[in-house]
From Swiss-Prot:
InterPro entries assigned: G-protein_beta_WD-40_rep (IPR020472), WD40/YVTN_repeat-like_dom_sf (IPR015943), WD40_repeat_CS (IPR019775), WD40_repeat_dom_sf (IPR036322), WD40_rpt (IPR001680)
UniProt repeat feature WD, residue ranges: 90-129, 132-174, 175-214, 217-256, 259-298, 301-340, 343-384, 386-415
GO terms for cellular component: ciliary basal body; cilium; cytoplasm; extracellular region; motile cilium; SCF ubiquitin ligase complex
Organism: Homo sapiens
Entry-linked SUPFAM superfamilies: WD40 repeat-like (SSF50978)
Record note on what altering residue 143 to D does: In CILD52; likely pathogenic; loss-of-function variant unable to rescue ciliary motility defects and cardiac looping abnormalities when expressed in daw-deficient zebrafish; patient-derived multiciliated respiratory cells show a subtle reduction of the beating amplitude; slightly decreased protein stability; normal ODA assembly to ciliary axonemes in respiratory cells
Disease implicated: Ciliary dyskinesia, primary, 52: A form of primary ciliary dyskinesia, a disorder characterized by abnormalities of motile cilia. Respiratory infections leading to chronic inflammation and bronchiectasis are recurrent, due to defects in the respiratory cilia. CILD52 is an autosomal recessive form characterized by laterality defects, and mild respiratory symptoms.
Record keywords: Cell projection, Ciliopathy, Cilium, Cytoplasm, Cytoskeleton, Disease variant, Flagellum, Primary ciliary dyskinesia, Repeat, WD repeat
Protein's gene: DAW1
GO function terms (MF aspect): ubiquitin-like ligase-substrate adaptor activity
Full protein name: Dynein assembly factor with WD repeat domains 1
Record-linked Pfam families: WD40
Family: Belongs to the WD repeat WDR69 family.
Cited function: Required for axonemal dynein assembly and ciliary motility in ciliated organs, including Kupffer's vesicle, during embryogenesis. Facilitates the onset of robust cilia motility during development.
Effect after changing residue 129 to M: In a breast cancer sample; somatic mutation
């Protein structure tokens, strides 16, 4: 084995190793999820080198420098104030979703007008209109981190795959018998998964456009799905109150997570794939062991339905958003609530951490989005100006751009 190069991954912090084995180029990652501003870098490098034979003594200084660069990134954007940069009247009919590519250089909007539009974030210019669906375009995604393809899922029961560069449709995936309401690319960008009101999810091959597997087992609509970091597992959350873990390589059921007593609203893995977080209309979130499917904790405290939930990039913090108008931050280790985010005057339907993990973004029916301190729960900023409910909001990878989508048919870029 011969080490060819070292690459940085900023969020979550890590070093990627490119090496040659039997003439083949391979990559592996060293996750540095516990890296903090006060970490002793020399001691950490020593520890890493003990565990990783590819990092010989001749690489010590290089690895030190890389980790110092990661350390510097950790505190960036902590005092960033967002200003309204552009208001885009994106579509004639209502918007359904917004999504950013990894760098934040462009984003997409889905709409009831049956199209998906691609936008340049810096100028607010429309780059392309993806036309071809025969009904509402509801679920949309980039194949991040690559960002050269877009998937759109529609009420016309099909999913389409598009080129970002040309706007050309590569494939139309047909097979669902009801509306497609969620979709996701696997991390390797070889598969796209679609979830439907027909109670099934399907995996599709991006290269040849063929269906790979149908995931059957739910008895009601699938409204949430996501892959784990390594791409070998996929979870589907359903209105049947359960979440199913599937083997993405075989299409087989691995575990059924039973315990919620109402519809599932969100389901996601933490970064190291050890835990699954589920949110439900039963006012609770649950944490599950991703290997055996056992429930390890129930996160309580909200007075109404949980509408969204997420881990931060390192998996140390959990955020929950509720119809009770509050959000909460929990420690994944202790499962205790460490902050309650109060200030919205309507239900919170979207919540996400910035990649640095120090800020949270919430979108609400009170027509505002808010930025919060993820440690203290203090509201740092209110993003005002929309004239109707905000249903979608997102940070870019650097954490210095926010996009908000509203029922007022506009998208706002904040930077």
């Amino acid at each position: 084995m011969k080490l060819k190069s070292l690459l940085l991954r900023y969020y979550p912090p890590g070093i990627m190793l490119e090496y040659e084995k039997h003439g083949e180029l391979k990559t592996k990652s060293i996750d540095l999820l516990d890296l903090g501003p006060s970490t002793d870098v020399s001691a950490l490098v020593e520890e890493i080198q003990k565990a990783e034979p590819l990092l010989t003594a001749s690489r010590t200084e290089q690895v030190k420098l890389l980790i110092q660069r990661l350390q510097e990134k950790l505190g960036q954007n902590s005092n960033h104030t967002f200003y309204l940069f552009k208001v885009l009247k994106a579509h004639i009919l209502p918007l359904t979703n917004v999504a950013l590519n990894k760098s934040g250089s462009c984003f997409i909007t889905g709409s009831y007008d049956r199209t998906c539009k691609l936008w340049d974030t810096a100028s607010g210019e429309e780059l392309n209109t993806l036309e071809g669906h025969r009904n509402v375009v509801y679920a949309i995604a980039f194949n991040n981190p690559y960002g050269d393809k877009i998937a759109t899922g529609s009420f016309d029961k099909t999913c389409k795959l598009w080129s970002v560069e040309t706007g050309k449709c590569y494939h139309t995936f047909r097979g669902h018998t009801a509306e497609i309401v969620c979709l996701s690319f696997n991390p390797q960008s070889t598969l796209v998964a679609t979830g439907s009101m027909d109670t099934t999810a399907k995996l599709w091959d991006i290269q040849n456009g063929e269906e790979v597997y149908t995931l059957r087992g739910h008895s009601a609509e699938i409204i949430s799905l996501s892959f784990n970091t390594s791409g070998d597992r996929i979870i589907t959350g359903s209105f049947d109150h359960t979440v199913v873990v599937w083997d993405a390589d075989t299409g087989r059921k691995v575990n059924i997570l039973i315990g919620h007593c109402a519809e599932i609203s969100s389901a996601s893995f933490n970064w190291d794939c050890s835990l699954i977080l589920t949110g439900s209309m039963d006012k609770t979130c649950k944490l599950w062991d991703a290997t055996n499917g056992k429930c390890v904790a129930t996160l309580t405290g909200h007075d109404d339905e949980i509408l969204d939930s997420c881990f931060d990039y390192t998996g140390k913090l959990i955020a929950t958003a509720s119809a009770d108008g509050t959000a909460r931050i929990f420690s994944a280790a202790t499962r205790k609530c460490i902050a309650k985010l109060e200030g919205h005057e309507g239900e919170i339907s979207k919540i996400s951490f910035n990649p640095q993990g120090n800020h949270l973004l919430t979108g609400s029916s009170d027509k505002t989005a808010r930025i919060w301190d993820a440690q203290t729960g203090q509201c740092l900023q209110v993003l005002e100006g929309h004239t109707d409910e905000i249903f979608s909001c997102a940070f870019n990878y650097k954490g210095n751009i926010v996009i908000t989508g509203s029922k007022d048919n506009t998208c706002r870029i904040w930077r």
